[in-house]
Each structure stands twice: as structure tokens, then as C-alpha cells.
């Protein structure tokens, strides 16, 4: 070895490291979320069918094993009071509780608590241990039970094991195997921060963000006056599931805390009674943990050494577990029966007066003004404590609306139980979608309004000859094909893959509020629905019946067939919901801000139009190629929401051609913004200066963004005209059937098999 030569072999850096595109261009349009639907990310393979696996599950044996686990305390993580029930309730609650009704994202639907960022949130400290306690059971039952189902079912079993009968349980949540990058959790850069979601929020804390005295070291005597929580967020702080249990920004004001609670739980689709029941019911079990300040804990699981094998927050205080556990920084046991359902939470809340104190970790909490020591110690049977509560607990008494509800429950505990188990069931199942996805022997018979129920099909479905007849009749009904296409799209594209709401089934496009949404062009919609109802009435006078939901989709499909000159698959079986089956207020959250496929809407100062388009495509469960081909096809079909010519880059509108891409990528065009908003653009011939087209940001992004342009170029090629039509038809069918969970598990993709009966 020559002198000066490094004795250590040079090792190159590795893939994925170094300065990334997002470092150079932090505001670039990110299409990575459209790649989350790639089945290659699933180690179980693209043909894995969780529904079929779940049907093989010995459900009773699983519940028996979970019941046994509740009291099988492990030395490496001992059970409080000898029972893991409180821990597992928190695990299930924090899995499902990330759901927000605004965009349907979050929730426990695919087991995201296992991945970043949720697995490292300050509010999820110690849940790494809860999931590890479950691993032997998950390993035993394997593919028959997903992590997503198991975490929530375990919370249910925990309640039952402590004397709280539940409302039921439905399985059917298939696991994902990667972090969901689509969810906007907030713009704060420090744990427990709120300075982005609130106009005058706090910066947050350094270190690992365990909630203790850190967050209110800056003297604040009054709660913040601006509590307008940023949309679509529900949590009050970065890294919390709900609200700050110490009070707004750590200020122990129960009345102010009630405001945050109402906002947060409201955005989870819970009313005041459901909110109060969840807090009271959840806090009837277990305890919080704040044995010492957070300086005693190590990094979160994602930041820890390999030797910890996914564990985080290693605790150097005392034994590091049991009585020395540090989780939230609060040290509260709410009732004298922490492993048994009772009404003692409310009894104590109203029996005692409360005074502020500091936990051993320095957090604000409340202790009863009494000499009674009636609360058991979690690990020493000879020790008793005074009752304690959180600031958010006192809100259940101090807020007038909550106080009215909870005082009644003090005298009528059965009403509390009924409200709690229903709210708990809703919490766990709000993002499950239609009942056709619900699996298992404990699915409740009672149909609930928040399910967005649709009637079950009755009688024989329409067959091939019926479909052919109806296609002819809808095309002869005097409605322009473009209007039929727009209406079918409007009906089906209300679907949200996040919480499986919306879609064409139910024909809710004819009901409030969807019939009045601007994007659905109410005047035109009424015209189309009237014509289709006429066709339906005539057909239904015979022996077979067709739902309006099916007819809306069939009419759009027939119009696409006419424009494409190829057969477009159609699968009947939809039914029509009633207004009474529709929670209009809840459905308001499904109204789109933009729909780039119909060239509708525009961005804001905070979010660009094209970012909203990618967001919409993700909610529709589309890939980038599907987003591109569907947009180009809808433009060629003249399907803009208002019939405008923006982006209709063709001399033959109404025909399914690739003209949109050919003309968008024409080098002879020069585009200029029509005004300072840069939402509308005009395309000029470079030589003559003649204006040829107008376009919006919805259109021009496909020529500007490198990845989207690469796909657009593919469809603009002379040898891909047939591919364009084929891919558009496949994308159309996908949109029309996004909510058809009743058929998705019965067959593979239609495009791989051709049109099989009764699909046409």
C-alpha cells in the first residue's frame, strides 16, 4: 500500500441518499402518492385476497387468545393493574382516531400505525409495545387476520374482557405495507407544534416531544384567541391524535379545552354526545403514565439503534417500565375500577372539586380536593391515590353543552353505555365504507345512517339483451352524449378511496346535497335525470327493473361506446338510496374543490390547482397514467363540467381520440397566461400569432410536469392511438366501479378477461 493511501476501502454512497429533487424544488408537484397503489409493494402478491383469507379465520379461537393475552403480563412490559385492557383500547383508539371526515384520510383502515410518522408520534408513545405484545397472535393466525383488523379487534376484546359489552365488530381491512404519503398531517416542523394549523399557535418542543412541562415553559396566561383549525386537520397539535390533554397550548383551561374537543371530534364526524361518551368510556379504563420528565426517554422508534428492533422511547428512569413508565407525561388513573366498566368516572367528576397540580413529569393535571385515597396503584396493592383528572376531563363538566349530557348519564348509566359502544363502533368503522366490505360473525344487524346505506338488490339483474335495449333508449332520449358522460362521471367520481364513501351506487347524485353542487351543473343534471327517469319508468313497466344508479352509469357508458367505437364494460347491480338514508350534512364533505377531469375549480394561495388534481386522482385510487389518460379522454369527449372549450384541443369533440395530447405537445404552440391569476391560458401559433386554444392549469400541467408529460407523450404517439382508447376504457370502468365492493372480490380485472356475462 502506497504512502498516503487510505487503508479503508472506499465505499460509494447508496441509492436514495444525497440531495433529492424535493430539496432542490420543494414546491414541485409531487405525483409519488399516485404510485402507492402499485400491487408490487405487497409481499403477499397481486392475487392475494384478504376477504377469502378472513373467511378461513377461526374467529372464536382468535378472540379467546386475545382474551387470554389481556392478563398475561410480560416482564419486559408489565400490564397496569395486571390487565393490558387500557393499553389495547388506546392502541385501537389511536389507530382509528386519526380519521377526519373532511378528506376521509387517516383512520385504522390499513394499519398505518405501524409506519412513519404515526409509529413515532408523541401521542403514540408505548404503542410500539402494544403491537409487539400482539405479534405472537398475528404470527399464529397469519394472513387470515390483518394488522389493521387485529389492532381494532383487540381494542374491542379489551372492552369486553372488562365487562363492557360492545356493539359488534366488522373485519375486512386489508393491510398496506408502506407509509401513506398522501395524508396532510400539518406543516409544523417540531413535535406538538401548532403554529401552522392555528394562526397564533405554538412552535412545539425539542427532543422527542413527550408531553410534559416543556411545551409551556414560555409564560402564557391566556389561551390563544384564534382557534380556527386549519382544514382538513382534526388534531390540535402535530403528533397528537386529538387535543392537548393539558388544555389549549398546554394552558389548563377546561372551558377553552371544550372548544378544541368539539372542533376535533366534530371533524372526526362525532357529535357532542358521541364525543363525551368516547372520552368518558375510554377514560373509564387504565391510566396515563408520567413517572418522570421526558429527558429520561430516548429517541422514537424510527430514530433508535438497530439493536432496539423497532422499539423506541427507551426509558432510563428506574426500571424503565411498570411504575416507572413515561408516556404522555401525565400521571392519572381516573377511576377506582380501572379494569372494569363502571360509572365511577362521572361519579368522581361531579362528586369532587378539583385543583391544579403538576405531574412528576411537570405536566398540568387535576387532583380531587379530598382526603380520600380511593384509586388503586397499578403495581402496589397496598398503595392508594387520590382521584385525578385531565383538563379535557373537566371540560365534560365545565362546558355547558357537555355538562347537560354528562349529568344525565350520571343518573342514567345505561344511556352512557349505549352511546359509548355505538360511538366506539363508529370510531372503529367510520372509514370502512359500505356494508358489503364488512366481514365476520359480529357484524351488527342494525343499519346506521353514517354507513351511507344502500338497499340490497331485489329481483333478477338486467341481462345482455336488457342492457342493449337500454343503451339504445338512453342514446335516443334526446340528451347530448357529452351530458350523459358528465352525469355518469359526476355520480361515480364522488367516490373517495380514503374512507370508501361516495360513488355511483345509491344514485345520490339526484339527492341533496349532490344535486345542488356547482361542479355537477345542477340545471344540466336535472335535464339528464329527467330524461333517464323517463327511460327507467318505461323499462320498469315490464318484468325486470333497472335502478337509476345503474342507468346513470349505463348511459355514460353507452355514450363513451358511441364515441370510441369499442365495447365498454358495464356491470349492473347498483340500487337507489333515499334521502332518508342520506346524511346530507355529512355528504357535504364530499363536494370537490376541484375536479381536473371535468376542468372544474381552481387552487388557492396555499394550494395550487394541479396539486388538488393529484389529490383528487389519489382519492379516486388512480395511478399517474390513469390520471393522464382519463383527463385527455374527457377533454376529447367534450366533458368539461360547464361545456366550455378549455382544454378541448380537438376539431372533432365528442370522439374518443388522442387529440388532446397531440395538440398539447405541439411545438408550434406558445402559451401565455390570460390574466394575473395564471389559471386561464391562451395558446397561440408561433408563426401566425393566431389564438388556437384556451386552457386551464388542469390542462397545461400535463405538458409541464416531467412525469406527467412523459405519460402524455406516450399517448400522443402515432402508434398508441388504440392503446389510448383501450386505457381510457379501462380507466372509465374503474371509476364507474370504484365503490362496487360487492363485485371486486368475485373477479379479476375485466380488461384481462374480456367482457364476461353479465358485464357488457
From Swiss-Prot:
Compartments annotated for it: namely:
Cytoplasm
Gene Ontology biological process terms in this record: cellular response to hydrogen peroxide; hydrogen peroxide catabolic process
Q: Which GO terms describe its molecular function?
A: catalase activity; heme binding; metal ion binding
Q: Where is this cross-link: Tryptophyl-tyrosyl-methioninium (Trp-Tyr) (with M-268)?
A: 93-242
EC numbers for this chain: 1.11.1.21
Question: The organism sits in which domain of life?
Answer: Eukaryota
Catalyzes what? Answer: H2O2 + AH2 = A + 2 H2O; 2 H2O2 = O2 + 2 H2O
Q: What is one GO cellular-component annotation here? A: cytosol
Q: Which cofactor does it need?
A: heme b
Basic and acidic residues compositional bias: what residue ranges?
Answer: 213-226
**InterPro entries cross-referenced by the UniProt entry:** Catalase_peroxidase, Haem_peroxidase, Haem_peroxidase_sf, Peroxidases_AS, Peroxidases_heam-ligand_BS
Q: How does it assemble?
A: Homodimer or homotetramer.
Q: What is the protein name for this chain?
A: Catalase-peroxidase
Amino acid at each position: 500500500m502506497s504512502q498516503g493511501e487510505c487503508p479503508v476501502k472506499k465505499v460509494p454512497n447508496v441509492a436514495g441518499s444525497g440531495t433529492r429533487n424535493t430539496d432542490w424544488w420543494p414546491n414541485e408537484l409531487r405525483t409519488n402518492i399516485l404510485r402507492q397503489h402499485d400491487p408490487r409493494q405487497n409481499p403477499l402478491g397481486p392475487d392475494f385476497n384478504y376477504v377469502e383469507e378472513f373467511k378461513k379465520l377461526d374467529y372464536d379461537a382468535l378472540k379467546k387468545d386475545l382474551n387470554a393475552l389481556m392478563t398475561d403480563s410480560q416482564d419486559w412490559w408489565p400490564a397496569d393493574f395486571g390487565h393490558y385492557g387500557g393499553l389495547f383500547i388506546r392502541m385501537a383508539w389511536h389507530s382509528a382516531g386519526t380519521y377526519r371526515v373532511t378528506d376521509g384520510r387517516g383512520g385504522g383502515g390499513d394499519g398505518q400505525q405501524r409506519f412513519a410518522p404515526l409509529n413515532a408520534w408523541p401521542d403514540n408513545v408505548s404503542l410500539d409495545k402494544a403491537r409487539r405484545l400482539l405479534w405472537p397472535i398475528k404470527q399464529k393466525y397469519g394472513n387470515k387476520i390483518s394488522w389493521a383488523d387485529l389492532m381494532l379487534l383487540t381494542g374491542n376484546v379489551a372492552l369486553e374482557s372488562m365487562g363492557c359489552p360492545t356493539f359488534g365488530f366488522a373485519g375486512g381491512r386489508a393491510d398496506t405495507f408502506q407509509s401513506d404519503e398522501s395524508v396532510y398531517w400539518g406543516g409544523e416542523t417540531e413535535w406538538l407544534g401548532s403554529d401552522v394549523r392555528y394562526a397564533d399557535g405554538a412552535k412545539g418542543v425539542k427532543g422527542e416531544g413527550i408531553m410534559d412541562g416543556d411545551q409551556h415553559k414560555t409564560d402564557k396566561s391566556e389561551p390563544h384567541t384564534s382557534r380556527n383549525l386549519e382544514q382538513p386537520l382534526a388534531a390540535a397539535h402535530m403528533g397528537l391524535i386529538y387535543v392537548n390533554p393539558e388544555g389549549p397550548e398546554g394552558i389548563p383551561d377546561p372551558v377553552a379545552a371544550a372548544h378544541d374537543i368539539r372542533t376535533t371530534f366534530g371533524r372526526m364526524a362525532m357529535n357532542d354526545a358521541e364525543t363525551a361518551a368516547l372520552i368518558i368510556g375510554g377514560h373509564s379504563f387504565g391510566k396515563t403514565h408520567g413517572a418522570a420528565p421526558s429527558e429520561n426517554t430516548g429517541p422514537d422508534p424510527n430514530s433508535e439503534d438497530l439493536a432496539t428492533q423497532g422499539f423506541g422511547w427507551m426509558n432510563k428512569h428506574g426500571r424503565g417500565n411498570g411504575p416507572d413508565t413515561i408516556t404522555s407525561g401525565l400521571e392519572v388513573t381516573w377511576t377506582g375500577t380501572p379494569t372494569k366498566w363502571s360509572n365511577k368516572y362521572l361519579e368522581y367528576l361531579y362528586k369532587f372539586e378539583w385543583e391544579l397540580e403538576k405531574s412528576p413529569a411537570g405536566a398540568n393535571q387535576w387532583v380531587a380536593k379530598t382526603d380520600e385515597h380511593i384509586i388503586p396503584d397499578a403495581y402496589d396493592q397496598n398503595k392508594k391515590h387520590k382521584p385525578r383528572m385531565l383538563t379535557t376531563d373537566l371540560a365534560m363538566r365545565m362546558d355547558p353543552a357537555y355538562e347537560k349530557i354528562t349529568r344525565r348519564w350520571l343518573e342514567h348509566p345505561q344511556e352512557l353505555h349505549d352511546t359509548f359502544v355505538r360511538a366506539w363502533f363508529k370510531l372503529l368503522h367510520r372509514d370502512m365504507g359500505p356494508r358489503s366490505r364488512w366481514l365476520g360473525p359480529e357484524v351488527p344487524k342494525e343499519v346506521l345512517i353514517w354507513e351511507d346505506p344502500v338497499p340490497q338488490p331485489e329481483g333478477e339483474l338486467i341481462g345482455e339483451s336488457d342492457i342493449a335495449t337500454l343503451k339504445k333508449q338512453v342514446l335516443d332520449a334526446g340528451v347530448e352524449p357529452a351530458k350523459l358522460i358528465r352525469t355518469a362521471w359526476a355520480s361515480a367520481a364522488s367516490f373517495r378511496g380514503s374512507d370508501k364513501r361516495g360513488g355511483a351506487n345509491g344514485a345520490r347524485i339526484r339527492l341533496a346535497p349532490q344535486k345542488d353542487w356547482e361542479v355537477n351543473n345542477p340545471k344540466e343534471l336535472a335535464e339528464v335525470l329527467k330524461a333517464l327517469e323517463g327511460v327507467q319508468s318505461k323499462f320498469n313497466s315490464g318484468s325486470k327493473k333497472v335502478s337509476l344508479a345503474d342507468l346513470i352509469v349505463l348511459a355514460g357508458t353507452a355514450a363513451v361506446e358511441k364515441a370510441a367505437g369499442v365495447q365498454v364494460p358495464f356491470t349492473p347491480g347498483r340500487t337507489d338510496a333515499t334521502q332518508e338514508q342520506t346524511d346530507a350534512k355529512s355528504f357535504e364533505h364530499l363536494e370537490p374543490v376541484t375536479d381536473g377531469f371535468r376542468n372544474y375549480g381552481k387552487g388557492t394561495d396555499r394550494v395550487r390547482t394541479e396539486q388538488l388534481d393529484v389529490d383528487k386522482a389519489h382519492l379516486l385510487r388512480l395511478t399517474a397514467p390513469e390520471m393522464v389518460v382519463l383527463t385527455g379522454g374527457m377533454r376529447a369527449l367534450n366533458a368539461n363540467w360547464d361545456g366550455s372549450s378549455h382544454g378541448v384541443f380537438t376539431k372533432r369533440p365528442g370522439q374518443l381520440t388522442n387529440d388532446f395530447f397531440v395538440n398539447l405537445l405541439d411545438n408550434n404552440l406558445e402559451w401565455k397566461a390570460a390574466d394575473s391569476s395564471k389559471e386561464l391560458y391562451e395558446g397561440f401559433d408561433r408563426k401566425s400569432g393566431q389564438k388556437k386554444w384556451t386552457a386551464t392549469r388542469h390542462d397545461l400541467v400535463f405538458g409541464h410536469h416531467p412525469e406527467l408529460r412523459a405519460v402524455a407523450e406516450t399517448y400522443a404517439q402515432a402508434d398508441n392511438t388504440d392503446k389510448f382508447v383501450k386505457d381510457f376504457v379501462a380507466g372509465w370502468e374503474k371509476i364507474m366501479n370504484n365503490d362496487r365492493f360487492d363485485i371486486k372480490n368475485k373477479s379479476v380485472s375485466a380488461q384481462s378477461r374480456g367482457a364476461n356475462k353479465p358485464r357488457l
